[in-house]
């Protein structure tokens, strides 16, 4: 028994001895024989941890058509520690020039943030407050006199960055510009310096082949647009400035994150922005990737559905441009001129034969007057009557979102400010389009009834003794309207009728009803808007420089005085008229869904902002009067709608008086169908002369809307028959 145990012990000892010998041999081979080889290999491998940029969410229209998505791209960034090592082992300045030369050879532009001209004589350029603060921080840190000239600053940079005297002034400026950008980012502790955004793949290949130290290729995304329309709605994304970084850093954004700058990209940033991931990459000395391990998976942003119908949006922009160009051509202006800072706008915006209009317009201006002023801008908005949802928001002139960033400086100085969103930020006196509000206020307060008749004598004489006797528009032709009730007064747009109603109401009650209609109030849209102003006693002095008098009340009653509203406000006001006083929020968000569309994050809920309460017969009287504007031969929109058969239309034209030497703005509102309203439209043409000149825009929009609806109804019917 003892012998067996002894044998087993010997065997186990022998096994352990053999294993120990094998291990020692392997260790000897690893450390002594091949140690140097493995050491060199490990030194030549590099492990880096980098951010994986999460894709931004898509933007879709109300029917799920993708308007904005993402395209993979590559940015060139500067790695400060590699390009500018503390031991001066790299000729940083020579590398910078080589890099810029490569970039230019491949037709790319690099981002130069030094606010000094690129060629002598060197001078400071115009910069934003943010860039000015960066420059001041740089000068303070590097002990440069804050009053130093551009030449003096560049001279100090040549010394600081050891830029050889053999380099030309232009070459030194290139080096200084890039080193300044890197240095500034260190000072403000933000992102890496992105030298080139969306770099060409050929350039990327050359950079990688040359294994250029200090230059990183970073995978990113750029926005891809499936439409050239809706620029003012969609907005754009870009790198953060200092103020934005302070705001978004608290939310966990990386310093090099791209964020929404305007439009829905900005408004719905919290839904669209994704959460970045991290990846650990092991690379060989030649740049070959050996392994890639995601330590945190990126989470793409959510997808946002808008209330906009992109097909109707396109039709609205085309209709607006077509009518504007027709009027411009009629007045002798060159419609081929590039007003937009963008040469790729559409040929379809050509000039048609203008719709004939009456020689006299009941909204305030003689069409036969000589027009000396050029149309400077226009806006149109289409909303759903029953929900308040914006279906189309158009501003002229516009631009192509996909080329906006590269054309930005050109757009900033382009004729008529194409970046300005007139539909939401332009404010205009409503003119006679305000008269339905005055009518409802008078009917509700019982200063008039639907049967009240007021005689138009051409001149309102109640305050003639005080030297104030405003006239009706028709009196310029030595005519009067005779005796009108409220329906006929709306058809005729009789100033005398509405002067009388306004005088009996007083400005305070008139203001109350206007605000209930949303005029001078926020609409609830998430994109930046102006709220305008409804004429009132409190701020009249601020607007006019005089105290409020009764004449101001009379002018307010016909849409003049201090009243200024946006096209969106006018469209929602018109929708509230069509909806018997119910005003809904103009929120442009339909819903947001997760990146894979599986989960609903948020959904639009109908919100009633205010209600104008009055009897149905009062609404009927106003609706009928607005309908007659389109269908009665005396109506100011009759020339546009007399042969329109797609639906019944209720409308009102208006003229915003601009002053003695400036052609009036044209204003137009409408809703359709009259019997069961679906959409409301507002159109404004700056210096359009009269509201009747805007009516063709609305007709074109209505034709498109009911054509789309008819096609949709046919499809649904065919689908139900197949079931």
Where are these regions (language model features)?
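Membrane-proximal periplasmic segments of bacterial cell-envelope enzymes
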Residues: 1-272, 276-298, 310, 321-379, ...
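Beta-lactam-recognizing serine transpeptidase/beta-lactamase-like catalytic domain environment
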Residues: 66-69, 74, 283-295, 308, ...
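Loop/helix-junction capping segments adjacent to catalytic residues or to phosphate/diphosphate-binding pockets
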Residues: 85-86, 314, 691-692
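Solvent-exposed, polar/charged alpha-helical surfaces in well-ordered, non-transmembrane soluble domains
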Residues: 93-97, 101, 201, 205, ...
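Short proline/glycine- and acidic-rich turn/helix-capping motifs at secondary-structure junctions
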Residues: 222-227, 715-723
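Short strand->helix junction
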Residues: 313, 327, 427, 687-688
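Flexible helix-coil linker/hinge segments at domain or subdomain boundaries
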Residues: 707-715
């Amino acid at each position: 028994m003892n012998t067996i145990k002894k044998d087993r012990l010997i065997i186990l000892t022998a096994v352990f001895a053999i294993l120990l010998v094998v291990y020692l041999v392997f260790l000897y081979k690893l450390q002594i024989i091949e140690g140097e080889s493995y050491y060199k290999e490990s030194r030549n491998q590099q492990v880096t941890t980098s951010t994986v940029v999460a894709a931004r969410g898509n933007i879709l229209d109300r029917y799920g058509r993708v308007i904005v998505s993402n395209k993979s791209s590559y940015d060139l960034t500067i790695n400060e520690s590699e390009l500018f090592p503390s031991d001066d082992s790299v000729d940083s300045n020579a590398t910078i020039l080589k890099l810029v030369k490569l970039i230019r050879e491949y037709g790319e532009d690099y981002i130069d943030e030094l606010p000094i001209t690129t060629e002598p004589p060197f001078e400071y350029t115009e910069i934003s407050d943010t860039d000015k603060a960066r420059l001041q921080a740089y000068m303070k840190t590097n002990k440069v006199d804050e009053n130093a000239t551009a030449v003096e600053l560049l001279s100090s940079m040549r010394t600081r960055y050891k830029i050889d005297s053999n380099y030309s002034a232009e070459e030194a400026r290139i080096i200084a510009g890039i080193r300044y950008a890197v240095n500034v980012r260190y000072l403000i502790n933000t992102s890496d310096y992105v030298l080139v955004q969306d770099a060409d793949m050929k350039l990327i290949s050359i950079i990688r082949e040359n294994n250029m130290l200090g230059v990183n290729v970073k995978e990113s995304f750029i926005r891809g647009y499936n439409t050239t329309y809706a620029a003012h709605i969609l907005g754009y994304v870009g790198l953060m400035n200092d103020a934005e970084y302070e705001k978004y850093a608290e939310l966990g954004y990386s310093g090099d994150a791209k964020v929404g700058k305007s439009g829905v990209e900005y408004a719905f940033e919290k839904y669209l922005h994704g959460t970045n991931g991290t990846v650990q990459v092991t690379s060989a000395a030649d740049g070959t990737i050996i392994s890639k391990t995601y330590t945190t998976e990126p989470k793409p942003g959510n997808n946002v559905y808008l209330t906009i119908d992109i097909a109707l949006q396109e039709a609205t922009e085309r209709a607006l441009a077509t009518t504007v160009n027709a009027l411009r051509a009629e007045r002798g202006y060159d419609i081929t001129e590039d007003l937009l800072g963008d040469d790729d706008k559409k040929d379809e915006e050509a000039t048609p034969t203008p719709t004939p209009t009456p020689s006299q317009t009941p909204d305030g201006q003689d069409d036969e007057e000589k027009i000396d002023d050029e149309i400077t801008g226009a806006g149109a908005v289409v909303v759903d009557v029953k929900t308040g949802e914006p279906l189309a928001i158009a501003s002229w002139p516009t631009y192509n979102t996909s080329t906006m960033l590269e054309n930005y400086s050109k757009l900033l100085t382009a004729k008529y400010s194409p970046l300005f969103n007139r539909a939401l930020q332009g404010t205009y006196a409503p003119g006679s389009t305000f008269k339905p509000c005055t009518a409802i206020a008078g009917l509700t307060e019982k200063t008039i009834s639907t049967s009240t008749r007021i005689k138009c004598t051409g001149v309102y004489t109640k305050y003639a003794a005080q030297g104030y006797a405003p006239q009706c528009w028709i009196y310029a032709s030595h005519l009067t309207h005779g005796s009108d009730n409220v329906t006929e007064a709306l058809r005729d747009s009789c100033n005398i009728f509405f002067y009388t109603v306004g005088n009996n109401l007083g400005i305070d009650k008139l203001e109350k009803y206007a605000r209930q209609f949303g005029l001078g109030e926020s609409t609830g849209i998430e994109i930046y808007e102006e709220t305008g102003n409804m004429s009132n006693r409190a701020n009249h002095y601020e607007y006019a420089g005089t105290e409020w008098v009764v004449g101001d009340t009379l002018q307010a009653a016909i849409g003049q005085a201090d009243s200024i509203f946006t096209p969106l406000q006018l469209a929602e006001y018109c929708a509230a008229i069509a909806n018997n006083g119910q005003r809904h929020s103009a929120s442009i968000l339909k819903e947001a869904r997760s990146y894979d569309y599986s989960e609903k994050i948020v959904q639009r809920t109908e919100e009633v902002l205010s209600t104008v309460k009055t009897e149905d017969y009062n609404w009927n009287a106003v609706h009928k009067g607005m309908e007659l504007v389109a269908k009665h031969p005396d109506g100011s929109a009759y020339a546009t709608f007399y042969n329109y058969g797609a639906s019944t239309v209720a409308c009102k034209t208006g003229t915003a008086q601009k002053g003695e030497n400036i052609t009036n703005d044209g204003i137009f509102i409408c809703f359709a169908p009259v019997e069961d309203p679906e959409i409301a439209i507002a159109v404004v043409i700056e210096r359009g002369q009269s509201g009747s000149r805007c009516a063709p825009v609305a007709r074109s929009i209505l034709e498109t809307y009911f054509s789309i609806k008819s096609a949709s109804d046919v499809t649904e019917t065919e689908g139900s028959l197949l079931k």
